[in-house]
Swiss-Prot record:
It comes from Halomicrobium mukohataei (strain ATCC 700874 / DSM 12286 / JCM 9738 / NCIMB 13541) (Haloarcula mukohataei). A zinc finger (unnamed) spans 3-34. Binds 1 zinc ion. GO terms for molecular function: ATP binding; DNA binding; zinc ion binding. Its cofactor is Zn(2+). Belongs to the NrdR family. It comes from the Archaea. Residues 49-139 form the ATP-cone domain. Keywords: ATP-binding, DNA-binding, Metal-binding, Nucleotide-binding, Plasmid, Repressor, Transcription, Transcription regulation, Zinc, Zinc-finger. Negatively regulates transcription of bacterial ribonucleotide reductase nrd genes and operons by binding to NrdR-boxes. Signal peptide: none annotated. This is Transcriptional repressor NrdR.
Length: 162
């Protein structure tokens, strides 16, 4: 591992921790030339996952692209970086757990939508407005009505059980 500060190839591992879910390893490293300390993360390299887009083209699954879409949706919301990482990990694990090596972009959108709907309603609306390509205000209103109806149903169910 090269030092990101001076480029030296000789670094040593100071500390190693496995993530809570066991899917990655965090290592603290120190450069043996300049003593710069930095963190690296290791995760298993999955068999190549492909994404079939709406226009029929196929491209490699891009974890960073998924993360960027989620980060745009949760921007200026009370959602931590750790939560975003966990959401990305969950979606990626779900996709990798499927037999098919080619998944549709709509499946990815549905998985993210489901997670955001329970996490943060505003982030959910932001995400689905892009994912479903809303072009009219009525589309926002329909989605908001669905979210509010679901919340009302949940509220009524919790009050009737008391």
């Amino acid at each position: 591992m090269n030092c990101p500060d001076c480029g030296n190839e000789r670094t040593r591992v100071i500390d190693t921790e496995t993530s809570a879910d066991g899917t990655s390893v965090r290592r603290r490293r120190e450069c043996q030339r300049c003593s710069f300390r930095f963190t690296t993360y290791e995760r298993p390299e999955w068999e190549s996952l492909q994404v079939k887009k709406r226009d029929g083209t196929i491209e490699s699954f891009d974890r960073q692209k998924l993360r960027a879409g989620i980060e745009r949706a949760v921007e200026k919301r009370d959602v931590t970086e750790t939560t975003v990482t966990a959401l990305v990990d969950d979606v990626e694990s779900e996709l990798q757990g499927r037999e098919a090596r080619i998944v549709s972009s709509s499946l990815i959108g549905e998985l993210v939508s489901e997670s955001l709907r329970t996490l943060d309603k505003v982030a959910y609306i932001r995400f689905v407005s892009v994912y479903k390509a809303f072009s009219e205000p009525q589309e926002f209103l329909r989605e908001l009505d669905a979210v509010l109806d679901a919340e009302l149903d949940d509220f009524e169910a919790s009050n009737s059980s008391q």
